[in-house]
Amino acid sequence: MIKLIIFDLDGTLVDAYQAVGQSVNYTLGRLGFAPRSHAEIKRSVGGGDRKLMVHFVGEKLADQALAIYRPHHAKALGLTGGVRLLPGVLGVLKFLKGKGYKLAIASNRPTKFTRIILKKLDVLFLFNMVLCADKAEKPKPYPEILWAIAKRLNLKNEEVLYVGDMTIDVNCARRAGIRMVAVSTGSSSKKELKDLKPWAFISKMSSLKAIVGADLVSAR
């Protein structure tokens, strides 16, 4: 029986792509690079901000880029429209909390920015635990971040469900031995997600209520 539902953050619960795009292009401009399209930047997120910088400026300039990106991104997240909850998310979180499920977040974002987002959107109180790559033994797609959350909350793998929007999330859950629901609201396409054969697939977060509410979790 599922007792804990762990969520990825970006593309799963929130849309912060506008803020990410602004900060990436600001950083690129400061370093003399041409701006990149919103679509290209969106496709490149998921591995954490250092990997994002490496992707656009290379390993040699990554640390310099981070020193520019992070202060700008902290401000960009606070701007109107910089980050928002994806459709249906708030209702699903409140529904699950009301049903007695423990909720957690596993994100490759740094803890600082994750907490900025959750506080701004007034949903931090809904989560029993938030664990990010900078505080985990290894980032996704390595399984340690999911194991650490389950262990901290005294639960077994079979009592955990993970929800994410990227192929990296599917692979992370598979390595962890944890059931996974892929949702096509983020960076990976519907085909990319389905090709990896996650335990379940949904096209919008509100559909998660049916999976959990109908007790399909314990029946599968």
Residue ranges of model-derived segments:
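Intrinsic, low-complexity polybasic segments
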Residues: A214-D215
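A short, structured active-site edge motif that brings together acidic residues
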Residues: E40, V123-K138
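Conserved H-loop
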Residues: A34, V123-N128, K156, W199-I202
